Each structure stands twice: as structure tokens, then as C-alpha cells.
Amino acid sequence: VWYPALVPEDEVKLGQYTAVTRNPGITATLFGRAIRDAIPNTAAGSFPLIVISHGYPGNRYLMSHLGENLASKGFVTVSIDHTDSTYDDQQAFASTLYNRPLDQRFVIERMAELGKDQSHFLGGLVDAEKTGVVGYSMGGYGLINNLGAGFSDKAVNATVAPPNDLLAIHAASNPRFRDSLDPRIAAGFAVAPWGMLQTFWQSEAFAGIRTPTFYLVGDKDDTVGYETGVRVMYKAAYNSERYLLTYKNAGHNAGAPMPVPREILDSPTGEGADHYMDPVWDNVRMNNVMAHFATAHFNAYLKGDATMFDYLHVRRDEPAAAVGAVAAP
């Protein structure tokens, strides 16, 4: 969890994280700007909540660069370690398919409870009524479902799906599907969301999304697909204000993963490095561009800052961005 805090002016100590990497045999030391156990800044009132949801596999540190950044902009950010879906606990894919939407909703509810608990350090700090979710890959899969796009019946019966039609609770054909959605999710940021290329949705399902959503993807992403994947999702979500940012020539690692840990680069085999790196783009550059647009998106839709729309309405092929598209009507 990252949050706005009161930091003494003479405080120069930077935060450190000890994190398991994509090669579970290697543990990395990550350096950030957050200070552990800092005094929460409650004088400014409560802050909108942002939930960060990683891919399969991943962990809560993969997008720590974004968690820290958004907290510095006046948000409480929480990054999930998804059970059965982390580097050192990668279990059957079916568990992730079933649990990812549920995990995200559980964390929103738990953070809301902690925000109301005055004995907890988050007491009075969290405004869960204004929640944003960042989902990368399988995190994006869960996010898109939680925004209102129910899965197809083909997904429920897929060979990779959990048994006994468990996915039916997340399906568009379930008459109670929309009742399970959390109305506190007021903005989504979907990074290379998985599932369209794998027919887990029918295109008409995205009409069920009415929440402002920012889509980010590389146009060479062969994991989730571009023209037949994320662009289809973006175009079909016509009932929502939405944006699409494309990293030209980038693959599935566009934007979200932190730079490859030095411990992996220094290892004899370098195993796991390709989990973080893109063949074309520099990680820090991708992270910074993503943070720029995430800041604008969440400030606009969670805080009501209309000046942020100038940063979202970029022209196509501007040198400062990749490809930007304005919101749909």
C-alpha cells in the first residue's frame, strides 16, 4: 500500500523492496521513493483508491513504479499479490480465470473497511467510493469483467476454464452477473487486457461497460492481440468514455513491467529477463509514459479535474506519445 504521507524535509532515505522475480530462484532488491511506515497525511482528508492487479504470473512489485507515482499525486494505491498467480506460487491457470475478478472486488471492499477503521493507519485516508483499477494482462481480464463485460459461454466451457461451469458467475448470460459488480469502480486502466483473442468475450459484451476506461497496448502484442484483440474491445465499448494508447512496435510487456532487476541481468543465464523487457522500447520510457496518462485519467475521472482532459486528448502520432485517441461520445 502506498499513500500520501508527511515526510520531514530532511528525510533523504529512499525505500527498498525485497521481491521475488520471474525467476523464483532470484530475489531482487528494488529501490523506490516511498518511505516505509511514513505518517499518513490525513489533514487533506481522504484520497481516491487505486487498485493495481498484475498478470499471470506476477506480483505486487511488478508495477510498484506506478503505485509510488500515483500515491505522490494524491491517491491511495494498493497492489495485489494474487493467490495461485505469483512467481513463487504459480498454480493452475483456471484458478486465475475464476478468481481474478473476485480478488479485485475483495481488495476494494477490504480497503474500504480499513479506511473506516480509525484504529488503522488507513483510517480516514481511503475514499473507496471513488475507486480506480489498473489491470495488466490477466489483471486487465479481471478489470474488464468487473467493468461490465461478461464472459462468453464459450469461455465458461473452454478447456482451460475451471470445472463445473464456475466461470458462469462472470458470464454475460448469467442474469445476476451485473448485480455482482462493484459500483465504486469509477475508472479503469486496462493494460494489454487478456481474453478477446482467446474468445473469452463476444464483441457485444463490451457495450455493457459504462465506466471511463483507458486501454494501453503494444501493436505487436501476440499474447492478447492488437487488431483482433484490444482494439476490438476498445471499439466495442461504445457506451463508455474510453481512450486507446498504442506503443508502436511493442509487445506484451508494453508499459507495465518495471525494468528488469539487476540480479537477473547479473545471473549466469539471465533467465526471466524477457518477462520484463520489450525488444524495442526502453522500460523506463514506457513506465513514464504510462504514469503520465494514468495520472491524467485518474485525476480527471476520480477527482473531477477537467484540466486533465488536455493531456488525454492528444493528436495521433505526436512525438511525445505513441498513438492517442480521444474519448468516444
Per-region residue spans from a language model:
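Domain-level recognition of soluble alpha/beta enzyme cores
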Residues: 2-50, 227, 263, 276
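Mobile cap/lid helix-loop segments that gate and shape the active-site cleft of serine hydrolases
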Residues: 20-33, 148-205, 211-225
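Short amphipathic alpha-helix adjacent to the substrate-entry channel of hydrolases
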Residues: 32-52, 57-81
